[in-house]
Design a protein with these regions (language model features):
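Active-site/ligand-binding neighborhood in enzyme catalytic cores
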Residues: 1-45
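A structural signal for well-ordered alpha-helical segments within the folded catalytic domains
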Residues: 18-25, 72, 207-210
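A short acidic-Thr-Gly-centered motif at the start of a beta-strand
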Residues: 27, 51, 56-58, 181-186
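Active-site catalytic microenvironments for nucleophilic, acid-base chemistry
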Residues: 30, 80, 215, 219
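Short, well-ordered alpha-helix to beta-strand connector turns
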Residues: 31-32, 62-63, 187
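A structural signal for the hydrophobic beta-strands that form the central parallel beta-sheet
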Residues: 35-37, 67, 192
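Mid-domain catalytic core of redox enzymes
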Residues: 39-168
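Conserved flavin/dinucleotide-binding core of flavoenzymes
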Residues: 127-229
Length: 229
């Protein structure tokens, strides 16, 4: 767990030097298969013992497919989702968050000595709060200050990037579904992974992806591909 909401027993955080893109580039260097960019998948079909991936350009058949995306996106891709897939994947809700990279210090504590990696800001005691990350401290960046703010209540000055992302909401329904996700994995050759298997963090997505790859390997162990016949 990230420990953001607790004051005691804070975990020791570590970051990947030069940012999270480093592990994506490392995967790309080691991956022996083919990576197709700008090829959005429109539908996943389970037909005659294999899985068909439908894109705008062509269809391709596979022995197994891993849907490494948000649970609601995975559910929308399935041509004929099972009742269990509808129940578990559909139980996860998502919230769209605005994420702004900027250099506006007004989103930080007035005293610089109080700046930390994560900083919460509230205008009213019972009002909404914004969370700002001090990227210089997190990524050991020298020089100009850079901050990453989630859902800023006011528009920051000196914006470098302004994006919207969907984050899972871990309510009671989501946590109950999360405990049963392993029950739907592998049905008809379709496997699932994503940060929603954990707490929505990069580490959760990575761990989930490795687990899905291992489950595919175990499921296909000793089998002859139907596509080679």
């Amino acid at each position: 767990q990230h420990g953001l909401l607790s004051m005691d027993d804070q975990p020791q955080w570590r970051v990947i030097r030069s940012g999270a893109t480093q592990y994506l580039e490392a995967f790309e260097r080691q991956f022996k298969g083919t990576i197709k960019l700008q090829t959005p998948v429109r539908q996943i079909q389970r037909v005659d013992g294999f899985v068909r991936v439908v894109t705008d350009n062509a269809d391709a058949a596979f022995d197994a497919v891993i849907l490494a995306c948000h649970s609601d996106q995975a559910l929308a891709l399935l041509e004929q989702p099972s009742l269990l897939e509808q129940q578990l994947l559909g139980a996860m809700r998502y919230k769209t968050s605005r994420v702004v990279l900027h250099s506006d210090p007004s989103f930080m504590p007035a005293r610089r000595s109080l700046w930390s990696s994560w900083n919460a800001q509230m205008y009213e005691l019972d009002g909404p709060a914004t969370l700002s990350f001090w990227m210089n401290r997190i990524q050991s960046i020298r020089g100009q200050d850079f901050f990453l703010t989630l859902n800023p209540l006011t528009t920051p000055r000196q914006i470098w990037a302004d994006r919207k992302y969907a984050h899972p909401i871990f309510d009671n329904a989501a946590l109950q579904a999360q405990s049963r996700l392993k029950d739907l994995d592998g049905e008809g050759g379709v496997f699932f992974c994503g940060s929603y298997w954990g707490w929505g963090l990069h580490e959760d997505g990575f761990t989930s992806g490795v687990g899905a790859a291992e489950r595919v390997q175990a499921a296909l162990q000793g089998q002859t591909s139907l596509l080679s016949e």
